[in-house]
């Protein structure tokens, strides 16, 4: 027996609202990490980003800076499987034509860590060998991961003395007693004559 008109209309409405899933409905995004370095010149950033865009990639994160006469770039790019395959081939071609040394590696999104809290570290001191090594050793020996590092040297504004600065983001496990960690960190900085701040990360 056919359904009454009202019920038939209701079935058609539900069918229209129901999502239609296919294998091509939502392609899974993949990630690739890219590093590139080459002699500094105008257009390096354009050359690399053009290849990424032309292949359909999306730049999620990047770090770029001049190091002496070299220019270095780090990128995290997302895209579907076809984008990744095409991009790897185009990066090989770019290496041959641009003078850049390029390496790439497939990767995955880092899962959120609920057992760690981000802290920032700011250090300024007279330039001296071994500062970054000492800081890295301090945190490593306590099971604390380093999420980000940026350093630079510069001349002090009034005296012209060579200065060194460090900015770090460290991931402190929740099991670590932060007050004790800060005290130990300040003891190290006092011993090395470093001006330093350790404080919670502010997004």
Residue map of PLM features:
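A conserved regulatory-domain signal marking ACT and ACT-like small-molecule sensing domains
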Residues: 27-203
């Amino acid at each position: 027996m056919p359904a009454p008109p009202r019920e038939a209309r209701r079935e058609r409405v539900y069918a229209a609202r129901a999502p239609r899933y296919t294998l091509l409905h939502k392609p899974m995004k993949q990630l690739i990490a890219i590093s590139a370095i080459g002699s500094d010149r105008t257009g390096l950033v354009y050359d690399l980003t053009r290849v990424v865009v032309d292949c359909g990639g999306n730049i999620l994160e990047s770090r770029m800076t001049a190091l002496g006469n070299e220019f270095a770039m780090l990128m995290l790019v997302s895209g579907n499987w076809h984008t990744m395959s095409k991009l790897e081939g185009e990066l090989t071609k770019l290496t041959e034509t641009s003078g850049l040394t390029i390496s790439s590696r497939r990767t995955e999104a880092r899962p959120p860590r609920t057992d760690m809290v981000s802290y920032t570290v700011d250090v300024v001191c007279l330039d001296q060998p071994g500062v970054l090594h000492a800081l890295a050793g301090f945190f490593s020996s306590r099971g604390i991961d380093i999420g980000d590092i940026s350093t630079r040297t510069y001349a002090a504004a009034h005296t012209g003395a060579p200065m060194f600065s460090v900015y770090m983001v460290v991931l402190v496990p929740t099991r670590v007693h932060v007050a004790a960690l800060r005290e130990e960190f300040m003891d190290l900085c006092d011993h090395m004559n470093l001006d330093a701040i350790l404080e919670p990360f502010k997004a």
